[in-house]
Amino acid sequence: MEKRILLPTDFSDNSWSAIVYALKLYKDEVCTFYFLNSIGIEAPTMTYTSNRLLKTMRENALKEMLELKDMAENSNINSNHKFDIIISSEDLNESIENAVNKYDIDLIIMGTLGATNIGEFFFGTNTVHLVNNVRACPVLILPEEFDFVEPKQIAFPTDFNHFYSEKEIEPLLKLADLYNAKIRVVHINIEESLDELQKYNLIVLKSYLHNYEHSFHWMPDYAKITTEINDFITDLDIDVLAMVNYKHSFIEKLIKEPVIKKIGIQPQVPFLVIPE
């Protein structure tokens, strides 16, 4: 079955790195990759000057998009990969939302947006905003200029307070299918014990993972969630971090941590954000 992948780009090295990652991730799959560039101009009303500017920006974007498409085709070895370009005059969030709906996108793969320049890598506040607003499609966000590593180990943090539907778990399973990845479910809590609701949600999650190699882990709640998750990633050589973005989820808790509010999310590996 053909997969449809959306690749937002600003023509930076970081966005090219995300494109290369996507091509390698789906190297054996039938895919159409959609390159998206947003040239939205923030203005209350379009004037003659802004219309001329928008036309110039669109012409420049088209030239760069065609060059980008040519680069992707020349560096690609899968004849079952197709490429298309989308140039939008709307802001990035609207551009992505419209593209997801129009082209029935399966996954968005992107580098960071609005990243800080303070030495360490962070998901910028623009990316955090995008994660909170894209609700129709999962998003795979990559660390800056991240070199492709086959996703063999996927971490899935949960507190078991949320009932996961099959639709919510499906993007996780599809990613695991690509490279027969092991799914490591990690429960971060003060105590290892579960209440009745959590036990039920655990049973349901186990049923979804029945045909996949998986394991369950418990971590004490000893620090900030960012620290705990990064420790888990390091200890078990995790290749991808996956979470469902629901109310009171770990993603919401991450974003509410003071350091995240100021500078964004600090990942070590690609981060799959699945909408509720």
Regions found by a protein language model. Give the residues of each.
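Charged docking surfaces used in two-component/phosphorelay signaling
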Residues: 84-95, 223-226
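A short acidic, glycine-rich active-site loop
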Residues: 52-63
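Small/aliphatic-rich secondary-structure junction motif
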Residues: 1-52, 153-219, 235-238, 266
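A short helix-to-beta-strand connector/capping loop
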Residues: 76-84, 210-217
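A short, acidic, amphipathic alpha-helical segment used as a generic capping/interface helix at domain edges
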Residues: 222-234
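Gly/Ser-rich helix-loop-strand patches that form or flank binding pockets
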Residues: 97-147, 234-236, 240-276
